[in-house]
Amino acid sequence: GIFSLVKGAAKLAGKGLAKEGGKFGLELIACKIAKQC
């Protein structure tokens, strides 16, 4: 459901932020949430 999606997004955000830096990680999460990849 919604909560598992949010948890997954948070995990991806954490990894993305750590690995790629803020902007890329946030854009990836926004893309996943909006389903407009």
From Swiss-Prot:
Keywords from the UniProt entry: Amphibian defense peptide, Antibiotic, Antimicrobial, Cytolysis, Disulfide bond, Hemolysis, Secreted
Taxonomy, superkingdom: Eukaryota
**Compartments where located:** Secreted
Instruction: List the InterPro entries.
Output: Antimicrobial_frog_2
User: Where does it sit, as one GO cellular component term?
Assistant: extracellular region
Q: Name one GO biological process term.
A: defense response to bacterium
Q: In which tissues is it expressed?
A: Expressed by the skin glands.
| Disulphide connectivity of cysteines | 31-37
Chief localization? secreted
Q: What family does this belong to?
A: Belongs to the frog skin active peptide (FSAP) family. Esculentin subfamily.
Q: What task does this protein carry out?
A: Shows antibacterial activity against representative Gram-negative and Gram-positive bacterial species, and hemolytic activity.
Can you say what this protein is called? Esculentin-2B
